[in-house]
A protein has these predicted regions:
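Flexible metal-binding regulatory segments at protein termini and peripheral loops
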Residues: 1-74
Length: 74
């Protein structure tokens, strides 16, 4: 199991409730260890097992919650 941490630029969040919705949706993905979303910074940080989940799946979960998302390349 290789756990990685990736950052996702997340647009459209206005308050802590928005962040919580994203955290719940992404947290349901297989392999996700932790997720923290910050509406003030427009950023979601996810630690996950890259054998179980992909950045595209995380972007999809954020989009499903109603927000725009893009992987931030380090």
């Amino acid at each position: 199991m290789a756990v990685v941490t990736r950052r996702f630029a997340t647009g459209g969040m206005h308050c802590r409730s928005c962040s919580m919705l994203i955290e719940m949706e992404v947290g349901e993905l297989s392999g996700v260890q932790s997720v923290t979303s910050d509406h003030a910074q427009g950023l979601t940080v996810v630690s996950y097992d890259e054998a179980a989940t992909s950045p595209d799946q995380i972007v999809g979960a954020i989009t499903k919650a109603g927000y725009a998302a893009e992987l931030v390349q380090d």
